[in-house]
Amino acid sequence: AYLTGEQMLERAGLRAGERVLVTGASGGVGSGIVQLARARGAIPYAIAGKGKEQAVLDIGAEKVITRGVADLPAAVNEATGGQPIDVVADLVGGAIFNDLLRILRPEGRYTTAGAIAGPVVQLDLRTMYLKQLQLHGSSQGTRADFRRIVRYIEEKKIKPLVGGVYKLSDFHRAQTDFMAKDFVGKLVVVPDAVADTAEG
């Protein structure tokens, strides 16, 4: 998750002092991006599900917008105090895609590595070329990204969030909980013997 997030920020060229809007910020990759943005000295704003706002603030989000808000551009503008968004790190896709492009400042950068709300979107090319936006797809990280992540962990700049640990024999329950999306971070499935050793 952190490797994917680091590559997204690297491809978008996120720099210290810039503002980044993170969708899906309570998930494994999204929560990683919030922390990775802070580690770079950037200012992360987040979109997360209802009831998860405080957890996302606790990992470093400047402000959290509740997913499903009626007017996303207005909510982001209010959250930033009218300051522009330099980068959108989108893990959701779907119906909010065009709003995310409208939220970006001229010459802003959009990066994606997910489409949980839907992979097919409509793009008004005028939005892209009149604002001179950069659109980046990202699916995997590099060794250099991995080395930065290890350094951030050693420096205690990031801390992976574990939303739950399940025995392999409880995989069905882990999948059910994953689909319910009632957690923040990642769910971990371990072999029964490892879980039994940890419990004992």
PLM regions: where:
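Mid-domain Rossmann-like dinucleotide-binding core that forms the NAD(H)/NADP(H) cofactor-binding site
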Residues: 1-70
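Short conserved AdoMet
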Residues: 15, 105, 182
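Short, glycine/polar-rich helix-capping loops at beta-to-alpha or helix-loop-helix junctions
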Residues: 48-57, 120-125, 147
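Rossmann-fold dehydrogenase core element
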Residues: 106-113, 122-164
